[in-house]
């Protein structure tokens, strides 16, 4: 017959391994449930190293943390002796559990039996308060890397007229080159027109010189023709024949004049014809002089641009 060894009552070791493998059983009906019953229930999850039953709660000390967590998962919320058990890890206090009121020093001991209620609350309060008071491990601060400041040199704006002048000169050169190209083409056209005008003026001058020479060579013949015409109009056919004879004599002494001039001169008096010829000569001369002055001005402008 084998005797079952009871677990010890030691459940208050302070080493981390013992704390992490300890189970707290709350809301326990200790009037009906004994220490042996608690050991029987929790021994199926692993070896129970210690068990202590107190008024309304109990502690179960396992030798392995894995066994303690398995017992918490398996027995939490179980109804035992008409009360629902509140089981969790002793080293991890439940956040929603209210802290027990501390009793007076006279109520700590009740005869021979030691009151673990005050002991448990006071012990874990001190334990977690001590852990909270521990200063955390100082984390080494990252040394900030000093970056060299980039200094931007301040450049003062100096007002200078040189670039503006150069720009103006360049634009002037480009515009002047374009104008020179245009003027060269225009000058070429003007030159061709002037040559044509000059040739026309030369032809007109030669014609005028020819007319003037003819008039100086035969001034009497023209008067006779005029007199014969007048006599023929007043006296009849005899004087008309004389006028025709005079006209024939004049024709033999000089070359025949153009038909337009003879007809116009015959229809007009001698004074009016002469004034008309002089006016035509003066108009042609003034026109030719203006054209020559204009050609000289354009040649001077072309030379200045080149």
Curated annotation (Swiss-Prot):
Recorded hits in SMART domains, A to Z, give: RRM (SM00360)
Per the record, residues carrying Phosphoserine are 63, 106, 135, 264, 288, 295
For bias kind Basic and acidic residues, which ranges apply? 217-226, 287-297
Taking the record's annotation, the residue ranges forming a coiled coil are 183-216
Query: Phosphothreonine-modified residues are where?
Result: 262, 286, 298
Q: Region entry Epitope (recognized by BKRF1 antibodies): which residue ranges? A: 227-253
Read off the Pfam families from this record.
Answer: RRM_1 (PF00076)
Listed GO cellular component terms? Answer: catalytic step 2 spliceosome; nucleus
Q: Which Gene3D superfamilies match?
A: 3.30.70.330
- GO biological process terms on file: cholesterol homeostasis; mRNA splicing, via spliceosome; negative regulation of transcription by RNA polymerase II
Residues where N6-acetyllysine is found: 44, 165
Known tissue expression: Expressed in heart, brain, lung, liver, skeletal muscle, kidney and pancreas. Weakly expressed in placenta.
Task: Give the Gly residues compositional bias ranges.
Answer: 227-252
Give the sites of the cross-link named Glycyl lysine isopeptide (Lys-Gly) (interchain with G-Cter in SUMO2).
4, 94, 99, 159, 165, 179, 191
Q: Which compartment or compartments is the protein found in?
A: Nucleus
Keywords from the UniProt entry: Acetylation, Coiled coil, Isopeptide bond, mRNA processing, mRNA splicing, Nucleus, Phosphoprotein, Ribonucleoprotein, RNA-binding, Spliceosome, Transcription, Transcription regulation, Ubl conjugation
Q: Pinpoint the RRM domain residues.
A: 21-92
Top-level taxon in the UniProt lineage: Eukaryota
Q: Which residues carry this modification: N-acetylserine?
A: 2
- Outline the segment boundaries, as ranges, of region: Disordered: 215-306
Task: Report the CDD domains cross-referenced here.
Answer: RRM_RALY
Miscellaneous note, as given in the UniProt record, is: Autoantigen found in infectious mononucleosis caused by Epstein-Barr virus. An epitope recognized by B-cells, which cross-react with the BKRF1 protein (EBNA-1 nuclear protein) of Epstein-Barr virus has been identified.
Family according to the record: Belongs to the RRM HNRPC family. RALY subfamily.
UniProt-listed PANTHER family: HETEROGENEOUS NUCLEAR RIBONUCLEOPROTEIN, RNA-BINDING PROTEIN RALY
Q: What is this protein called?
A: RNA-binding protein Raly
């Amino acid at each position: 017959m084998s005797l079952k060894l009871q677990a010890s009552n030691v459940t208050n070791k302070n080493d981390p391994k013992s704390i992490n493998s300890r189970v707290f059983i709350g809301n326990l009906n200790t009037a009906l449930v004994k220490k042996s019953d608690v050991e029987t229930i929790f021994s199926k999850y692993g070896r129970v190293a210690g068990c202590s039953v107190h008024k309304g709660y109990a502690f179960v000390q396992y030798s392995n943390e894995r066994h303690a967590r398995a017992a918490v998962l398996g027995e939490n919320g179980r109804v035992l002796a008409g009360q629902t058990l509140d089981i969790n890890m002793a080293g991890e206090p439940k956040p929603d559990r209210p802290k027990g009121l501390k009793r007076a020093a006279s109520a700590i001991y009740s005869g021979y039996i030691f009151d673990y209620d005050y002991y448990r609350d006071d012990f874990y309060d001190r334990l977690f308060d001590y852990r909270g008071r521990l200063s955390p491990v100082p984390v080494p601060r990252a040394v900030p890397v000093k970056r060299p400041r980039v200094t931007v040199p301040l450049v003062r704006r100096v007002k200078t007229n040189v670039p503006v002048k150069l720009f103006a000169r360049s634009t002037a050169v480009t515009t002047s080159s374009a104008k020179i190209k245009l003027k060269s083409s225009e000058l070429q056209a003007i030159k061709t027109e002037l040559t044509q005008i000059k040739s026309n003026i030369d032809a007109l001058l030669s014609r005028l010189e020819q007319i003037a020479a003819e008039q100086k060579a035969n001034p009497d013949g023209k008067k006779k023709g005029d007199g014969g015409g007048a006599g023929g109009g007043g006296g009849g056919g005899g004087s008309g024949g004389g006028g025709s004879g005079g006209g024939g004599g004049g024709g033999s002494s000089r070359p025949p004049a153009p038909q337009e001039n003879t007809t116009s001169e015959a229809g007009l008096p001698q004074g009016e014809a002469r004034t008309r010829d002089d006016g035509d000569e003066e108009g042609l001369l003034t026109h030719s002089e203006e054209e020559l002055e204009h050609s000289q001005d354009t040649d001077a402008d072309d030379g200045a641009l080149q």
